[in-house]
UniProtKB/Swiss-Prot annotation:
Record family assignment: Belongs to the actinoporin family. Sea anemone subfamily.
The name this protein goes by in its record: DELTA-actitoxin-Oor1a
Region named Trp-rich region, which is important for the binding to lipid membrane: 92-107
A GO cellular-component term linked to this record: other organism cell membrane
Residues at which phosphocholine binds: S41, V74, S92, P94, Y125
Domain of life from the UniProt record: Eukaryota
Location of the region described as N-terminal region in the Swiss-Prot/TrEMBL record: 1-17
Gene3D superfamilies: Cytolysin/lectin
Lineage: Eukaryota, Metazoa, Cnidaria, Anthozoa, Hexacorallia
Amino acid sequence: ATFRVLAKVLAELGKVSRKIAVGVDNESGGSWTALNAYFRSGTTDVILPDLVPNQKALLYRGGKDTGPVATGVVGVLAYAMSDGNTLAILFSVPYDYNLYSNWWNVKVYSGKRRADQGMSEDLSYGNPYGGDNGWHARKLAYGLKERGFMKSSAQSILEIHATKA
């Protein structure tokens, strides 16, 4: 995924005040199959892409609930990897920037595991990155590493590259 493609995905969300476009490049050597998307707050109007082959990208978007509600968008995407483990991606774009800021995280879980509130909390409190307009990288489990970038704005972009370690 490139910033240009993600900017187009973001624009398709229209005038939603808290929104995000997520792009995850699969450079893992295997394929990924969608398990689910879990939203702690916010929603989406698109279906989670079912299959992400190696050398392709997952593109997704989310936004705050419509109407006069004081929420942002916080979600987790879960993908079963062809090695039998689960790739999870957390994104958070808060409603109130006086109290919170954007953040994100990536983790590989052992076995097949759907995204839920427990996974959301694990990723939220498991040393997430700030959405600080900077690149961050770390080794993940099971032979993977990630490198990613998230904008600090209320209309955010999250770009992640998952590669062999």
